């Protein structure tokens, strides 16, 4: 895949944060003034502010797109997993975290859970192949804006995992490799099953990424989350931003900045294998990554998460590029007639 520019900036002032990273990446973007733009946010937490995309960042981005690109059609979109698991709606979470105010700035709010989930894809789970339903944005240019976080399945949770919001609420656990019922009684001490779960989740996210790939990843590292992410972790004041139209490179660079190995993140390895982006970066524009790197305290499951790397390498050594039968796996738009 042709390499796209990756930008890394260092900034600790909220008011200057978006301007600095966007000024740096703007000359390299394919965005046009006539584009219909969607900003995909992450509202994983129903109450946890540091689990979510910060409203101030999105507000600044809306103003930047209008003032510097002349974009007039902007939507802020999300299907909140935090809402689903707390018995609320995405609208409830929008209101709680001030996102209703984007309408005052001329943008629209779109609850992805309210859309028709007309697309279908098969995914790998611990109990076999299952089918999920998902939706798509009608935007010409999608910007995903997320904080850097740890995760109970992957060492790092970034822009690619944010695509889970397109999936029908009750199907999201299947993308992560198991059903909601199985997840509630999952035995994390069973290392083999946990490693298989990590592998399933990585493959599934890479497949979904093919269908709902963002146009631009913007990692808002003013604050991150360490420990028991992606919701119950502790905040980290970090002060960096990563941006790229190669979402795989953006996530890979951020994984390194957080102190983790890129090859330990299953969805990055599978996304690279599927030619969806580069999981290595060259000639980063901006500051040296070594100047920003700050090791995050990993999730308590990290020692088991690290075992997936050897599992994946062993599969490659045996020539198993993908152990899924092609005739079984498909994705298509459901016939609504």
Q: Where are the regions a protein language model picked out?
A:
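N-terminal and secondary-structure boundary signal
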Residues: 1-337
